[in-house]
Amino acid sequence: MAPDRLGPEGTARPNSSGISVIVVGLGIAGLTAAIECHRKGHSVIAFERMKDVEPFGEFGFESPYWLLRQPSKGDSIIIGSNGGRIFGKWGRGEVRNAMQAWRYTPTHADIYDTAGRFMAQSEIPKAADDMYFTLRGRLAKTFYEHAQSLGIDMRMGSKVTEFWEDSNRAGIVVEGERFEADCVICADGIHSKSRSLFTSLNAQPFRSGFSIFRGKADANAIIADPDAKWILDQTENTDQFKVFLGKEICVVIITCGLGRAVVCSAMHRDLNEAEQSWSTHANPDDLLDAIKDWPCRRQIEPIVRKISEDQFIDYPLLTVSPLDTWVSQHGRMILIGDAAHPFFPTSGQGGAQAMEDAAVLAICLELAGKGNIPLALHATEKIRKSRASVLQLNRTYSEGVQLAPALPKSKDSMSVPNVPVMDWIWHHCCQSYAYDEFDKVAEAIQSGSEYIPHNLPEDGT
């Protein structure tokens, strides 16, 4: 075991641990893994299928193939404080400072019926300084540029065709060239090519029966339109969060960056079961047609019209049942992020949980040392798997926005729960926990005894 501990804030000299790591996929999970492993002194080489990163791309999903893809299609992502405090340590606060303009500021969500009548207000607890509501592509771009500044070897346009391991090493094959390291971190998203190597269970993503229209509107165009600019009212002080509830569709319009961007989403029944792509380009008219009978359509339509067709998608909500293991047979490869536990984008925790995986893994590698790589990977799984699985199975967080079966006749009869912000989720510091618990976890693994995590809710659900 490593004798000295860097602690959550500590950074080692580059390549000082003697541990070599391959990262496959450069989404939120992969970028965080590359950066955190570098911080803890591990040697990192990362591979990404896409060829380049658009300099001002504003869009992407937690799948790496979309985070770094074409510019401008886009919407938002919430990073809870459990994730924000991880990148808050990077670059002496430089990454945190770069994201400060995108802090999460709404204090409540205003809920309306299909006629546009105000029904209720759902309180959003005051966000900590390390919670962010930002554009997905901007977050990925910021992480990528920080990784570049650290000199991390990131090879774009590299399609991995094979994974392999034995008791001593693990590696990949990229276009016929063989690479090896002490371990391979598989962060290749919900459509992971590596997942089938870890489990005999059916690990393919399946459709949930729901889908979401998603897109980013042009804020400058909205300002110029008298019928649309209502959404920017009061955004000089706080962002706006508007929800319009119908029986078969729920429309959400949110501003972020104090009105710098306006994003629109609409959860609806998934009627396109034959389509199996990650996302489907859609026309804003598809959304407007779904609310054609709503009296408040005239309020929503001017904003939706500001979303160009090439920035508008219909995103099927895919899921994967919790896996039986994240670690490969020889203990030299591990799944993290969406490859291990995909979340619905409505959960508000997909990105943060991926970051927790990456940060804990880097620490476990540090504490186990080069001679105990399988122990490090199994310890990461022990610390992270139960926590991620509880969140993955929790319907409040896995589905997020629920379609309303029927609205009450008046706002007085409507009971709307506040947004659930649970201390055990957002106030958790995964890095401190990993340092505190590693010895107990390692002992349990080596002795074959049970490890009971306490990074879960008290009732375990």
From Swiss-Prot:
Active-site residues, record numbering mapped to chain: R214
Q: Needs which cofactor? A: FAD
State where FAD binds.
E48, R136, D338, G351
Named from the GO MF annotations, one term is: FAD binding
Coiled coil (UniProt feature)? none
Q: In which pathway does it act?
A: Secondary metabolite biosynthesis
Query: Which keywords fit this entry according to its UniProt record?
Result: FAD, Flavoprotein, Monooxygenase, Oxidoreductase
Q: InterPro entries per the record?
A: FAD-bd, FAD-dep_Monooxygenase_BioMet, FAD-dep_OxRdtase_2_FAD-bd, FAD/NAD-bd_sf
What's one Pfam family the UniProt record gives for this protein? FAD_binding_2
Q: Which domain of life is it from?
A: Eukaryota
Q: Identify the EC number(s).
A: 1.-.-.-
Q: Which family does it belong to?
A: Belongs to the paxM FAD-dependent monooxygenase family.
**What functional role does this protein have?**
FAD-dependent monooxygenase; part of the gene cluster that mediates the biosynthesis of the indole diterpenes nodulisporic acids (NA). Nodulisporic acid A (NAA) and its chemically modified derivatives are of particular significance because of their highly potent insecticidal activity against blood-feeding arthropods and lack of observable adverse effects on mammals, in particular the tremogenicity associated with the paspaline-derived IDTs is not observed.
Question: What is the protein name for this chain?
Answer: FAD-dependent monooxygenase nodY2
Species this protein is from: Hypoxylon pulicicidum
User: Corresponding gene?
Assistant: nodY2
